[in-house]
Amino acid sequence: MTKLDAQRVLIVGGSRDIGLAVAQAVTEAGATAIIGARDQLRAAEAAKNVTGAEAVYMNITDEDSIVSGLEKCGRVDHIVVTTSAHHNAEVTDLDHEKTQAAFEAKIIGPLMLAKHAASILPSTGSIVLFSGVAAWNPDPGYSIMAITNGAVSFAAAHLAKELAPIRVNALSPGVIDSGSWDVMGEDAKQEFLSGAAESTLVNRYGQNSDITDGVLWLLTAGFISGETIHIEGGARFN
């Protein structure tokens, strides 16, 4: 038996990339993965490829959708939130709606999810939010990504205090070959990943397994709460 046997884990944003990898990992650890996504067809298709997984419609930017999605989930023991909406632009070129969408996906939505999940999670339950290395590496053109990721880290600490004994933590990935970079084309992707590897202290970029190992640990580490776990090969120091 593992610590996740018979547990039910909701992964919001679980229909692709890192979220889907998390769904597969918790299943292999003995849990039932509940794949939450705003694209119902993609969520259902993803669930078919993960043994025993369930799919539920959940739009993290719509509070009513969060409420109805949680109701359809039934029992939930842990929640992992991987959602994001990027708006990479210099401050002088920021778009109000895109900026708001980034905060909705990364901060406001997860806060609303915590609001409604607090009453259904068991005292031994947990929430894992996703921050990101950009928060610790100021870079022109990426301020919204950095600010929202930094806010996630602070949100984890404050939610851990308020929702205790439910544990809340954040995981901060670096550049991960998760599938999200495939749209660049193979040559451009490899050039990008090579550059990312050089920016770390361990001379490599991340794999999905690096992240899923961290998530599994946070889901089962009963004495860890309010923390941000950095999984980026020391990139924030380089």
Describe these PLM feature segments.
Residues 204-231, 236:
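C-terminal substrate-recognition "lid" of short-chain dehydrogenase/reductases
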Residues 102-103, 111-112, 126-164, 175-176:
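Catalytic loop of short-chain dehydrogenase/reductase
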Residues 49-64:
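Rossmann-fold cofactor-recognition segment
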Residues 153, 162-178, 224-231:
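Conserved Rossmann-fold SDR core element
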Residues 15, 23:
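N-terminal Rossmann NAD(P)H-binding glycine-rich loop of SDR-like oxidoreductase domains
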